[in-house]
Amino acid sequence: MQQIIAKQSVKNSLISIDRTTNIPLIGAIHIGVIDRGSNLLQVRASTYCNMKCSFCSTAANSREIHNYNYEIDLDYLLDWIKEAVRLKNDEVSQINIDSVGEPTAYPRIAELIRKVKSIQNVEFVTMQSNGTLLTEEKIKALESAGLGRINLSLHSLDDKFSKY
């Protein structure tokens, strides 16, 4: 059985990042915009995770390692995404939304997708997800916003091997 952590407990140690913080969103690995040197940019809007998988490479929901979670203001994040696209001479055709946690826990995920999809030359938007927060309604909203593909992280179909 999967162990799903209440989002409220995650929000208790939240650090909001917006224009007033002056925190750059290019260059960090856990938040913001990540350029892997191709036509794809990774976008990480928050660090929330609703799971506590023992094998997680980022230990996203471990209080022993991560005392705080981060959530980036949507408009501030979009400014940095557009700047990264500009710095790459508008040669970005794909945005992949992922996280060191669970991207669908970001409260404005559909709006993020819609606005990213409207950036010049961005043809395809994808997202990584553990799938546990997806409902039929949410999937339809993400698709309507312009999401082209959800890459589900399925660790095992057998509870014996899946360590939540």
How would you describe each model-predicted region?
Residues L134-K140:
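Short, acidic/polar
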